């Protein structure tokens, strides 16, 4: 029997990827963790494969790297070589990489070191910093399959604008990371490369659709990754792996020439943003990009420089806090002199319904077309999200307009609710930010069809939103209380997925911080404040 086209494509792509891992960076069979070993976050330190210097370099933040390279203390070559090696190991343990650019990266690092030695200065604020990119971002000469077998062996002829601008600022491209087929799943799985695993528990997902980036960054195989977010695709992975991240409002980060699904769907815009281990790295990314004036290349980019004055926060802040969204069910901030008030969020069900109608306005035709091209199947989790594509009907123009009008009315209603908090904050201002869960549960088991998450509000209303780590699952404290009762059918489904803390051992817990539109500077500053107050240690 002839093998289906998609299986042949997948086999060839995987062989191509593995051939680019140097033999000296391959894990010896005697050292490779057995499948039942779920926690591999500490493998680099315990394996004997890395020198103390390599461990020191890869554990640094992006801000540390750029600072030390700019003074000549570190070289771009040694940093790049170390992180490429760690990414190679991450791939073997976590299956998080799609495209490998190690040779090109090291060659670029040599060029940057030569420039620094000759000129005595850096080429830009990101000089020598290796940055990993979600598979969506086009890098000339490499595929951007976004999980579809039908997109394989079609290398990009030019870089995405964001890639060009970051390279211009001194960044080094060395790897692209795994995503789910369709880009519309909360787990990074596709038929080409397979499933990405969580380094803290390989039986758990890193989320999606930027799950490959999350695996790389949390494993210290990337200093800073670039993900995207249309309904939680950056925030969910950050929450599942203990990272900081930022979903900016549309227009702050260039999205030009990025491979994507749902092309032409502009009612809810996908945005690119940073994923990292420190909030200072969000600032480094955003300010460095703004300094390149992306609006001169990308007509969708707003002519808005990084506004340092907006990072200066009032002495006392007030945060709204929502335990859920009314559909699926702060002590240290108060101790630090800030106020925290309840924010009754009841829009969840309406937001989710509007989003789903927008994403399936074509009746699922695009997803079906791109899988039919090679005969590959859609995963059960995608079928779950689509509500089984065969049952979805394309929206009429009238229905689409009506749905977009609902979005406009909801935006006004939410703004009024935000403004109405002014009388309760004690600061003579409305709340400065809204803290709420990113998901109704910590990192889930592989193959889970998600009943619900909390990512849609920010995406639908285009609100600047950050993510920050809080804690990890505690096997003793996090059992389901006997007195718990669900708010809705979806709420019960969410708790059924959680079931018991043992299913989420070593999983991390993150929250999201929602600001207003185009408040990237303020939200980034508040993430730093929250980090300093919480002093998270997991």
Swiss-Prot record:
Q: Which superkingdom is the protein from?
A: Eukaryota
Q: Which UniProt keywords apply?
A: Antibiotic biosynthesis, Hydrolase
The protein's GO terms of the molecular function aspect are: amidase activity
What is the induction note for this entry?
A: Expression is positively regulated by the KK-1 cluster-specific transcription factor kk1F.
List the catalytic activities from the record: a monocarboxylic acid amide + H2O = a monocarboxylate + NH4(+)
Q: Null-mutant phenotype, please?
A: Decreases significantly the production of KK-1.
Which region ranges are annotated with the description Disordered?
1-32
Q: Where is the active site?
A: 134, 209, 233
Q: Which Pfam families match?
A: Amidase
Q: Which InterPro entries match?
A: Amidase_dom (IPR023631), AS_sf (IPR036928)
SUPFAM superfamilies referenced in this protein's UniProt entry, alphabetically: Amidase signature (AS) enzymes
**What GO biological process, any one, is recorded here?**
antibiotic biosynthetic process
Q: Return the PANTHER family for the record.
A: AMIDASE (EUROFUNG) (PTHR46072:SF2), AMIDASE-RELATED-RELATED (PTHR46072)
Question: What is the protein's known function?
Answer: Putative amidase; part of the gene cluster that mediates the biosynthesis of KK-1, a novel cyclic depsipeptide with 10 residues which is a promising active compound with high activity against many plant pathogens, especially Botrytis cinerea. The role of kk1C in KK-1 biosynthesis has still to be determined.
The UniProt entry's sequence similarity note says: Belongs to the amidase family.
Name of the molecule in the record: Putative amidase kk1C
Gene coding for it:
kk1C
